Amino acid sequence: MAEELVPEVLVAWPTRDYIRRPITGVFEFSQSSWPFSSRCVGELVGIFLPVMIAILPLPPQITQYFPHQLVSVLQWFAFWAFSALLIIPWLFCVNRFVIHSLGRTKRVKEALDDRTAPKTVIVMPVYKEDPVVLIKAIDSVVNSDYPSYCIHVFLSYDGCNIDEPYLQVINHLGIPISLESYPQSIDVTYQGARITVSRFKHGGKRHCQKQTFRLIDKVYADYLKHHDDLFLLFIDSDCILDKLCLQNFMYDMELKPGSQHNMLAMTGIITSTTERNSLITVLQDMEYIHGQLVERTVESGCGAVTCLPGALTILRFSAFRKMARYYFADKAEQCEDLFDYGKCHLGEDRWLTHLFMIGAIERYQIQMCTSAFCKTEAVQTFCSLLKQRRRWFLGYITNEVCMLTDVRLWKRYPLLCLVRFMQNTIRTTALLFFILAISIITTSSKIKNLPVGFIAVSLGLNYILMVYFGIRLKRFKAWLYPLMFILNPFFNWLYIVYGIFTAGQRTWGGPRADAAKADEHTTPEEAVEKARVQGDELNVQVDTFRTKTEEKGVPIRPSSKVNGRLSFAPQLPDRYYDYQGALGTSLAKYLTPLPDVPRIGLHPHCSSDSVATSDSGGNSISLPQHVETLMSAEERAKLYIGSQAQESTGLLHTQEADGGERGLDVQSNEDLEDNRAYEMHTIESGSGIPSGKAPVLSSSVPQSGMQQSRAVPGNMSQPHEHLPQPKYTKRPSRIPRQKRRYMQPEQMV
């Protein structure tokens, strides 16, 4: 057998071999490049060396010096290594989809209303988003198959400017654009859901999330003392939620029969959408499907997903507020090198996942929901795609190194870490298929020398899954997976090379010539502030920080204080929980602060886990103001009359359509009044008719923007504190009503 492995050796190298080696050598060398640690290069390449030797069709002038028996052993090792890495994850996927539901199916079988549905807070950061796209995203949230009374959207603008796009959006939500001044945060009720529109100082996505979290924590401070059923959903401003997304998330997080209510975080399935298909958008669509339904499914089966993307992630708020001080820590001036910057800024979603994985007390608390879907806009140009993937690559590789070198994760998720380690070794061969093609074209090697079995097994197993996904999700573009199998290695190689050569630039989208840097006249703190003044805090050359500032000891991995921090308090019936018990366990941790972190006084209301989300001071934030408090009496009256007339017209059209399907022509006046009570929060009796003026809609706003919603007055320090409850007699619901269990009045907040 060994003799058959070595072909007849030629005396001299053919000309094609001379041509081939310089070409493939460049790719092979770049595959071995590592921007952070030569030690990692040696380990990964050394482990994968047998696979390289067994697969690459090297010239016989080289292979003739290899020991025949050693080559045979290495080839068998490569075969079984590839087989294990392909078949085992494939079996994980099959098992996962047999047990769990895949697709846009309704999983909640009993009725949901404002008493039985958990409260959900949606955080949507906005930065220079098209108003039409943003309005579509907001409508997808409030029109979800979920009780509107339990939805609270925080629309947070990353910037304080009051420009035309901002006015178009608030006008669509029912906020007049004729106000003399606009407070930082405005509350409004839109289609039955509560929306808080805020403007914060420009500082990037994470800074916007931080300010929004502080606002949420202040609004729901008293509510969280007695409840643990508040959930936080992060989505992007261009994401379109599926109607069943919220409901299916809540099923896995809280409502599943027999649930222990200990799920910490989940992500869903993100698919791409575009108005015009091209090769780039089709490849992205297939990559989204394969990356989430295959890779994240395997991770979920191994104990936890390793990335909670900011485009679609739901968190238990009580768990997130315990990690907020670590996730939102202001350490921009302490970025000693590009590694720390890529870990905490470019890969902030993976960094948050890393914190949750360490804070969890057991496996399978960070999972993927295979029935929660959303759509996001696909990148249209290759230049934008290259910048996006460069950002993803740097955030991925830095957090991957942190994860695989953290002993705590190896102890808690041994199988997950092993699978991730094996998959990272394959990144060394991202261009393997391309190299093989060049080898056949430019050398004396023949097709029979190629590892056809490896290619067939890899393509075949993955293609079977992609065909199933295409049928199940009705996304038949997934059947073009062989095209992705051929082209993606080349694109991945470009992303890696571009990321390596631009890793020294601290910028969100790519290198810039005017990036702020530290020198003998500028401190790191001044460089960061200069970048913020320029309008982009991410435009800083962090490689100048190391020589211009003292060592501050920023840890590569999370502190040991994070380990097991997400322990749960005793669960009581009806989603109440022992807050005092949870407080007792957290106080001990607060009395022992992190190194180099000043002691912080306890919150007067004992919500200690929500303190210390910033190490830069200035922890005060104002509560949102109701839109009606900003209007005159005449404006409130006009706004009320206009909204009531538009609502009645819309309800009549809806009931006529429903009546046509059921053989009914009109709905009774009594039912109409009940519908009105459900769709809008009624004014307290005796308060009189509020007055207001309906705003004039800009011509660029969609026609749906004419449907205004009336805001409800009240003290916003409590979520819907003084709001009257809607009527429940003959109340229409998106979900068939069943018998409700009794709950305490405090839960009706």
From Swiss-Prot:
Transmembrane segment boundaries: 40-60, 73-93, 421-441, 451-471, 483-503
E.C. code: 2.4.1.16
MF term (GO), any: chitin synthase activity
Residues bearing carbohydrate: 715
Lineage top rank: taxon: Eukaryota
Deletion consequences: Leads to elevated spore production.
Protein's UniProt name: Chitin synthase G
Organism: Aspergillus niger (strain ATCC MYA-4892 / CBS 513.88 / FGSC A1513)
Name of the coding gene: chsG
